[in-house]
Amino acid sequence: KRGGVSAQDLDRHVLQMVAANQLTNLIKFVEEFNDTAWGKAIDSQTLREAIFNPDKYLKSPSRSTDTDLYLTGALARKAVDDHERVARQIAENYQSKLSPSSEQWLWAHVGYRAGLVWDRNALNYFKRSNPDVMSQEQQEWKVRAALLLEDWNAVLQATNEMSPNVKEDRAWTYWRGRAMAQSGKLVEARQEWIKASSPFSFYG
């Protein structure tokens, strides 16, 4: 650890930069940790290949001996350009090769990329993940993916699973109320709508 940051936290930060396509910043970030146990365990050449040339990396015969970080990074990088293909690859080829947390993180990333283009499969991808590994933006896109399908049970579940600081946003409170109303919970729905509108009330 450095400053109380674990290797898992550092891995996740690297993956978030891959997901955001901040590849140059990622390399600089890793170099800053060269003197740590985490940094020394990383093969910078392999990491570069995984994120800059994921197809070549995934076809490499030596890949089977590499760490979970490189495989997850390569698939995450590919998902930026072709989320559908990566979804198939995870399900058909890599499920047993990824750690559970990395697999869940990847499904959230694939769901997010699918959501951005209004792919109707986005919700299914998100459902294979876990809210605990999702960023705020991914949690919000999971709700949008459910709204796209008008799946009100999924809307309610997704808004309830949001982080506390996200779920109280007026927009998500409103949609949680809509989902409750669709299931016949009109009293609860009205309470949510009152919360959603309260900042605009006469009394502030």
Features from the language model and the residues they span:
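Extracytoplasmic and endomembrane cell-envelope/extracellular-matrix remodeling and assembly machinery
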Residues: 1-204
